[in-house]
Amino acid sequence: MDRLLDYDFHPPDDLRVFMYGQQSVLRSDGTALVVEADYGGTVLRHYAFADRWFKINVTTDRAGNFVEEQADPNPIPFCFNCDIATPMVADRNAVFAVDLWVDVLVRADGLTYYVGDEDEFADAMANGWLSEREADAARAGLTELIDIIERKQLIAFLSELQPFRSTEAPPANAMRRVPVSRFPLVHPYSRPSW
């Protein structure tokens, strides 16, 4: 595979596309995807799963040490930005997932966390942007993720998939936005998770 395209749908209309070259892909085996890219000296590692209702982004330095960010209006600095999302669907050199609004921000200790955007999740339900099945699975995914964090297993869980160590992550490619209408794998009523 020369490149991998990661389609990340943020309903109702924002389909973001991230492109990764072969050097960025650390794992892609149908069950999990792990990619990383350098954003000006800070490395962003992205984990997506075929059987879990969340994705996780981790910031490190090039030596593999965790780096915390403080981005307003978030109430805590964080290293792990966990998105409740549909499981990824792989299609040739692309993966697709739908962000389901709820975020879990976790500090570098892997234990201190904050759950945010639950109000946006409620609004999405009211607007019909996700199905009842997706809403129930999102709640279960949030419970599973919090359980991993509270059992002090987040770092071990991610390290088992791909150890944290020094990296030669290539520079990130620019993110693009594309029309949702062209991609039924993320469109309401036709996506597999609906």
Question: What are these model-predicted stretches?
Answer:
Residues 55-66, 78, 98, 128, ...:
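Extended soluble regions of mature proteins
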Residues 140-194:
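Cysteine/selenocysteine-centered motifs that mediate thiol-based redox chemistry or coordinate metal-sulfur cofactors
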